[in-house]
Amino acid sequence: MPEWNDQGIVLSAKKYGEKGLIINVLSENHGRHLGWFNNYKSKNILADVQPGNLVNVFWKSRLIEQMGKFKIELISSVSGKIFDEKLKLQALNSVCSLLEKFLPERQNYSQIFNATNAFIDLLTFQDESKNDYWMEGYVKWEIGVLSSIGFSLDLNRCAVTGSDTNLLFVSPKTGKAVSKEGAGRHAPRLLLLPSFLGGDNVIGSNFYKEILAGLNITSYFFKNKLLLSINTNKPTNLPNPRIRFVELIEKL
């Protein structure tokens, strides 16, 4: 019987029937994987399988192509560390929903696993300043996910002139940076490049506008590259937790 043991980040746990859960995890070495957990009520498992929690996962199945069953042991709980921080909780839900949406099942994405684990550590890090610079890490995490799946952005040099200065925009066609000189009359059609991604401070000093500009870049490529490649004939939209995350930032 096929089986494996691995670390995993819980993406979701959905009730199925009276006693069962279908748990979705991003494992370190076995990719995004579903598994059945039986009789969850008697085992007090719900607190352990909250989105973002790091768990030890044992998977076993009669046949490799079947969903199989999970045994779960909690390694680290996340939500309890940020339960009173609405924006961070929404960021965590956004991360899990994007991975669940875009990662194919059972393909090894150890790079994304490690990046996600590192971002969750950043998200839950407690310091006295209570600043929001973890949001920059969130945008860079999304860029890393795009790159790992096959849609890399090149933000270090102008695609038109080859210059590494005055980088103000990103081309929605190529995902490459464009300088002020290279943009010319096409500037209104380009995406703004915030300073924390190498832009020449085109957006000014408003931190949250910078974050929204970064999220606008990743939103564009998630919707117009990844979603279109998944559903070519259906309306495309990002997962609701990701949409709500942006809406919360817009209110700041």
Predicted segments with their positions:
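Non-catalytic alpha-helical scaffolds and adjoining flexible linkers that form interface surfaces
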Residues: 1-21, 26-252
